[in-house]
């Protein structure tokens, strides 16, 4: 794992102490004393006490935390009821059912009126261009959310309605999602990097009656005409018999055209004017955000909702190719993201927190919006990318806002490693106290660089494992309590009871490797797949009745640390984003030249994993560079740029079993030029394998 090398670099001056086992091997870094002194959980013993109580007495543990929030009416019945066993009936989880609350009221109104945080900065907004900056206080955010809630009400949005949001990382995105929550409407946020086809699919799946979007935005040097994509998506919806009745548009790149009194927020005009962006306007459907906000009152009574009412739908890739609408509910999600944020990042009131994730992903929902706001935190909201205008952008922002807690993805760390230490070390970073990673397992080399260069060997790293489906962190170190092992997500968070199962469903004790499952519910667990509870039960509970099945492999070492080994199902993790092989394959075979396709993951030095595609062509078609580019373009349009393959190989035949099943295990070996194929006795035509090896793409790893 590179630990001895890191030990040499540490020297006697390192404040992150190393622990050495009986055999002299490095076992991990202890939290620095200065972190422990002020930590909410200052020792491993204290963590173990709290974790044991949270698992053995979940109702009492979470009941005490629930007292920190406002409930319009108390829970009238059992605090927790659930069934994880498909053989005993319907799968369900209910926390505090019958209690009523509103998450927007808890994260805004209470912070302003009860906790007197009205003048505290909620977000520092940093635009794509350096110098495009603004800030918004809790009081200002509450006013804007109330105004936009009134806008939505005037458009007929009611409790239970679904609202699609397709926006870049601007303040209006936070305002829009909180306004939905205030009304009891479900927001369905679609990442602004997704295609018009993907947006259409998500609008149709949950029957969204309104779309909120933006004129356009820059991502680094690239101009994204988001309104054009939104229009294309709404046209596709109309063609399929579902006209969306209203589209509200934020004038973001065109903000400079607005008078000072017209601007709905404090966002400044963008520094790079964009006269070339042509916005098509659909009368009767399109409405300008700023015009609606001018007419809206700044007070809006929240809708009081059951703790088990849905809060939002967020789509994640499914192994069948059709995205799953993950449903999270109000009460349990609120408790869980607030608690994980407080303890995992060891949050204190003076902190400035920065999670670099886009709000279009679950990390952004939980740790850009809801978790920080529930704790009254000040956060950074960043529109740009880590390498624009230079490779030191992140660290200049850290210094600018004196960021104390920083949370990013391993893929970003690996990308920045390529540019060396200088872009990092020329900035102070003295404010940093805790670093975090999310999205995929971090390889030890990247962990060591992050620790040594970014954190100057004085910042604990919280390597967090969780999923869209879990709502918040599941396995994670705690900054003041957990000795860190590079690459390990370490131990379960409060309320989380992990187990490792073998193929027969038997729990493995001690050192073991197998399927990672969870034995009991935590408040943040998803409740269903929108409109398809059977799929929810089949995906997460059918394989091993009585357990929530993550779909990830896991290893537990002799010290009890958990190490995520990767997806067990046909899913790919590209730059921290989960992609379905079936979804990519479907996009490929829609091309007239492609008869059959198979997609596997391939190691990538920056993305972690990239797509390697095998395509079998229809008669009369020839494989060529032009066709390769056409296929890549088709995938970008159908799914989004994140799914663009790195490699596409011509495959006259695919290795299949005699029953016709494609042997993806063999294809993964071919992609990596690994001739150790294991048992191939079930391959119907072994000659196919030799041909694919001899014609494989030249890969970089």
UniProtKB/Swiss-Prot annotation:
Inhibition and activation profile: Inhibited by acetylation at Lys-661 and activated by deacetylation mediated by the deacetylases SIRT1 and SIRT3.
Post-translational modification remark: Reversibly acetylated at Lys-661. The acetyl-CoA synthase activity is inhibited by acetylation and activated by deacetylation mediated by the deacetylases SIRT1 and SIRT3.
Pfam families (UniProt xref): ACAS_N, AMP-binding, AMP-binding_C
GO biological process: acetyl-CoA biosynthetic process; lipid metabolic process; long-term memory
UniProtKB keywords: Acetylation, Activator, ATP-binding, Cytoplasm, Ligase, Lipid metabolism, Nucleotide-binding, Nucleus, Phosphoprotein, Transcription, Transcription regulation
Main localization of the protein described in the UniProt heading: cytoplasm
Modified residues (N6-acetyllysine): 418, 661
Residues annotated as binding ATP: 439-441, 463-468, 552, 567
Region listing for Disordered, in residue ranges: 1-37
EC numbers on record: 6.2.1.1, 6.2.1.17
Motif (Nuclear localization signal): 656-668
InterPro entries to which the protein is assigned, alphabetical: ACAS_N, AMP-bd_C, AMP-bd_C_sf, AMP-binding_CS, AMP-dep_synth/lig_dom, ANL_N_sf
Tissue-level expression: Expressed in the hippocampus.
Residue span of region Interaction with TFEB: 1-107
Disruption-associated phenotype: Knockdown in the hippocampus decreases histone acetylation and is accompanied by impaired object location memory and defective up-regulation of immediate early genes following training.
Annotated binding of CoA, by residue: 219-222, 363, 575, 636
Residue stretches of biased makeup (Basic and acidic residues): 1-26
GO cellular component: cytoplasm; cytosol; nucleus
Enzyme class: ligase
PANTHER family in the cross-refs: ACETYL-COENZYME A SYNTHETASE (PTHR24095), ACETYL-COENZYME A SYNTHETASE, CYTOPLASMIC (PTHR24095:SF126)
Subunit structure: Monomer. Interacts with TFEB. AMPK-mediated phosphorylated form at Ser-659 interacts with KPNA1; this interaction results in nuclear translocation of ACSS2. Interacts with the 'Thr-172' phosphorylated form of PRKAA2. Interacts with CREBBP.
Physiological role: Catalyzes the synthesis of acetyl-CoA from short-chain fatty acids. Acetate is the preferred substrate but can also utilize propionate with a much lower affinity. Nuclear ACSS2 promotes glucose deprivation-induced lysosomal biogenesis and autophagy, tumor cell survival and brain tumorigenesis. Glucose deprivation results in AMPK-mediated phosphorylation of ACSS2 leading to its translocation to the nucleus where it binds to TFEB and locally produces acetyl-CoA for histone acetylation in the promoter regions of TFEB target genes thereby activating their transcription.
Listed name of the protein: Acetyl-coenzyme A synthetase, cytoplasmic
Native source species: Mus musculus
